[in-house]
Amino acid sequence: MRLATWNVNSIRARVVRTVDWMVRNDVDVLAMQEIKCKPEQFPIAAFEEAGYEVAVHGLNQWNGVAIASRLPMSDVQTSFSGMPGFQKGMEGPDQPLEARAISALIDDVRVWSLYIPNGRSLDDPHYRYKLDWLGALAEHTRHELAANPNLAMALTGDFNVAPTDEDMGDPSFI
């Protein structure tokens, strides 16, 4: 399986570039982050015309994740156990979940497309959210692998760890 991941920063603005890149590079599975659209707004037809099926989890103009695959996908999940939500000014377990995780079983591999929260500054509530989110992901992953020791798992995505644009391969490409 040829697997790639890409923060597309709005799939509707980059659908042609994304599909062309996938075909040109013979990508079997693409995990996308920051799709910035609802599932009904995702340009699925362009991917289907190129031979891909798509699983999408998006809520609005923020965040959002998707997986496009030439291989059959099953058991699509749009969150993981313990995944925290976030809403500025709100605390507790009732915070809404953001569209930051989607996974599918593809060719006996659990493929995750993850858009890890940006921590912003150390004193911002979003920093605590990022740490809680990563902790919940680690716990979920440990539990899944302990329960299914033969499970192959790929955790892919935008982990939001680059402190400056210079850490990007080519900032002008976006």
Report residues per predicted region.
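Metal-dependent phosphoesterases centered on the DNase I-like endonuclease/exonuclease/phosphatase
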Residues: 50-51, 133-174
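Structured beta-strand-rich core segments of catalytic domains in phosphoester-bond hydrolases
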Residues: 35-36, 42-121
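Soluble or luminal CAZymes and related metallo-dependent hydrolases
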Residues: 10, 14, 96, 129-137
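N-terminal, active-site-proximal structural segment of metallo-dependent hydrolase catalytic domains
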Residues: 1-65
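Active-site-proximal loop/helix segment associated with metal-binding centers of metalloenzymes
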Residues: 110-129, 168-174
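Glycine-rich, phosphate-binding/catalytic loops in enzymes
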Residues: 20-23, 46-49, 84-85, 129, ...
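Proline-centered loop/turn at the N-terminus of a beta-strand
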Residues: 2, 53, 110, 152-154
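Catalytic metal-binding/acid-base residues of hydrolase active sites
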Residues: 9, 36, 117, 160-162
